[in-house]
Amino acid sequence: MSDLPAHTSIWGELADVDHELRHVDVGGVRTRVLRAGSSGPDLVLLHGTGGHLEAYARDVAGLAEDFRVTAYDMVGHGWSDLPDQPYTIDVLSDHLVGLMDVLGIGAAHLSGESLGGWVAAWTAAHRPERVDRLVLNTPGNIADKPEVMVRLRESTMAAVLDPSDEVVRRRVEFLFHHKEMVTDELVGLRRAVYSRPGFVRAITNTLVLQDPEVRKDFAWDPDWVGRITAPTLLLWTDHDPTGGLDEAALLLEWLPRARLHVIEDAGHWPQWEKPEEYLSVHRDFLLTEAQTV
């Protein structure tokens, strides 16, 4: 039986949590940031392609009990600025490190979902001094399967070109194993983001990562993945449409200090579908296990 109250709304998840929502300047990019929690290690949460910080609405309160939590909208996403440039992994990683600089965070735990996991891993490999521990939450398509790239590109672009309730709902439902958990509010938020002036151009700049010619420079590869020294948790599910356990096995081979946890009965967004287990696994890995090293 769940220890968390039933989800009513995003505001309901945050109503009793001391938090701050604001924009900060990161190298000229106006960046939307939510922060909560006053003690414990820093934990930065990274959303996925076309996403926004509300992806973690069901988790902020629980995480803030033990961590100083930062969730943010990546450059070109959510309600952050949309500069006209390709949002490749190095650009997204530089934006993350720049945000940490602005917020005075020297090093932090990083937990990234989907694209956010890719960015977090790249940062851990190329800026190891900024990453304590790493959680890769359904990072997706480690094997660079063309059909997965096509599906993500086409479904995302369709929703941005036609941000109607029906089309955007279909895009959000792609993230869930339990489609009935997709709320009108969540769809409405995505519709608002996808309707922003300039967002068609922005999502085009994001989806360059689904072009094999661009992707090859940043694709998951043992050469750079093997340089990650941070202890790493691979957080998989049994119904992720972007990548199965065979891809988790690849990362277990490449990463020198990794272990796998599989959340059952969930899709690409376990942090929303299974928040209790998501929180428990994070606490165990980032707090309990860290103390035993």
Residue ranges and their predicted role:
Residues 1-43, 66-67, 105-106, 283-293:
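Alpha/beta-hydrolase fold catalytic core
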Residues 25, 29-79:
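Conserved HGGG/HGGXW glycine-rich cap/lid loop of the alpha/beta-hydrolase fold
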Residues 31, 147, 163-226:
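Conserved alpha/beta-hydrolase catalytic His-Asp/Glu region
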Residues 121-125, 132-168:
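Flexible "cap/lid" loop of the alpha/beta hydrolase fold
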Residues 214, 239-243:
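Acidic catalytic loop of the alpha/beta-hydrolase fold
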Residues 228, 234-236:
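Short beta-strand/loop motif that positions the catalytic acidic residue
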Residues 256-293:
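Catalytic active-site module of serine/aspartate enzymes centered on a nucleophile-bearing elbow/loop
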